[in-house]
Amino acid sequence: MSEPVRSMHRTGALRTPLPAARNAPPRAPEPPTVVPKPPVKRRDSFFDNAKYLAIVLVAMGHAWEPLRGDSRAAAALYITVYTFHMPAFIVISGYFSRTFDASPGRLKRLVTGIAVPYVIFEVAYTFFKRWAGDDPTYPISLLDPWYLTWFLVALFVWRLTTPLWKVVRWPLPIALAIAVLASVSPDIGDDLDLQRVLQFLPFFVLGLCLKPEHFQIVRRREARILALPVFATALLFAYWAAPRMNAAWFYRRDSAQELAAPGWSGAVMTLGMFGCSVILVACFFAWVPGRRLWFTALGAGTLYGYLLHGFIAKGSRFWDWYELDWLHTPAGEITVTVCAAALITALCTPPVQRLFKFAMEPEMEWAFKKDAKTSARGRGAHRRR
């Protein structure tokens, strides 16, 4: 073999060339990763039914108030309903406050869902009283809740103190002790309606202590049957007590001394009424249906109905509607009851909720700082653009 050929052989010049590399077919783009949405939390029909029925009783109680002076039966119904309707509502509020942990998100909802509506409705009620009540000098005071707004103040305070009640060893006995002390303390005064805040406190704390199985117990068939004679006994006792008892005890807005009673009676009445209220609340829950009914959806709008019906309830007094003689007959009392139930039902409907959402559930993102995670997420998205 000649030298040039040998040289070419050594350098690989005579090697068989490799086949041309084929372009790999383009890979199909991977489908985008779909992040599953968290499941929508379904509302519990039982509690929505309970809230709706409780708020109907609240409206009926307000409608019966001007009638009880002329009708012992109306007075008995009034006392019976006032024994448990707000306690039931407050127990439910406490039960659904169990997860409150003072995190930024929950504090924001506390401000927008409780504090802001309080300011709006306190001012609105004041102007309504000036106009409809012919009291043009009635002052605006956020420290003196008028009529129904006391509940918003109380709920704000109760919910804000929830983390404290979750760490103390005996929350309910402590809450009862506070309520008893309030009932014998006339110097508490009227600021923020603290008497009601403190005297109704045990029902909120009771709700915090309850678990789902406790509600299952009162919803048994045996409990429903037992609730009937209990309510009948309560009505009979209320009929006997109506002309003998000061109904202001049920409002829990005054101390014993302010009701012209001896101081020791405040402790007795607070503990006795708490026991009676808890029994009737349990009987009320026993009768609440657990399935979805035509009024179940209205349970989401009970706070709307509660605050809005106050204008009609007070207006009926300002405008002397109850001066009509026929309203103080059995037929008139039934008519008032039906009208109160129909009114509160209408005020809990979705159209009314949409109309007044600006006042009850305002969007106020502009008023709050963004938390660190949200801010970092926003900066990261901006950099990727």
Regions found by a protein language model. Give the residues of each.
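Alpha-helical transmembrane segments and their immediate juxtamembrane cytosolic regions
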Residues: 2-385
